[in-house]
Amino acid sequence: MHEIKNQYTEKQGYHDVTHTHHQGHESVSHASCITVVPIFNHLEGEQMEEIMKVTKSTSFKKGEVIYREGDISDCLYIVSKGKIRIYRLSESGKEQLVRILNPGDFTGELALFRESIQEAYAEAMSDTDVCMISRNDLQEFLLKYPTISLKILSEFSNRLETSEKQTTRFATEKVDTRLALFLAECMESGDGPMEIELPMSKKDLASYLGTTPETISRKLADLENEGYIKQKSGRMIEILDLDGLLLV
């Protein structure tokens, strides 16, 4: 991944990506993209079929870059299968994880409103299937089916809230608190077992929380020693004292 830093000159556009990965097209179902993504799954069957006709699909191997900072941004990318990490690189080469996309999530939404270039990197975290809809096609659908616009605005609102929360924590909270709040937010509501699975590696979690993997490991051990959590196999963590965790 470090070799990415010096590859700013390659400007991949909508058509470049689809041609580069042409061999993977046949294995990706357009229907699986359209029906799984929240901004489309409320549409009627005929409306979905209309969108599928202009959707292009491709596959990416683990570690492969979908787009780079500086690339032309001219389409919406929808994750059909797998995971994508969106991150930025500082001038010194330090990585900052922005978000992780799961099936049904999308990126490239700014291209819907204006011509622009990518401001971050998108990399496949596992073998990943992606569907793409060009800006021109999607703008037509936004006019034709206004409910899509409302769904996109809702997602914008969620991302803005998350971004503001993350920025505030970076400025005001110590690493212990950032980590504790992250673990608490991973909890699903309900009365079931208080167990979570970390949605990313410790390296990515460190990047997301603005620290180092070593610090994450040390802070998790501290939280365990203090009786707030119990680390299990893999990425599983049991929350033993949620109220106490929220006060860290």
Where are the model-predicted features located?
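Short loop/turn motifs at secondary-structure junctions and domain boundaries
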Residues: 49-50, 66-70, 190
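Cyclic nucleotide-binding regulatory module and flanking cytosolic helices
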Residues: 2-61, 107, 111-112
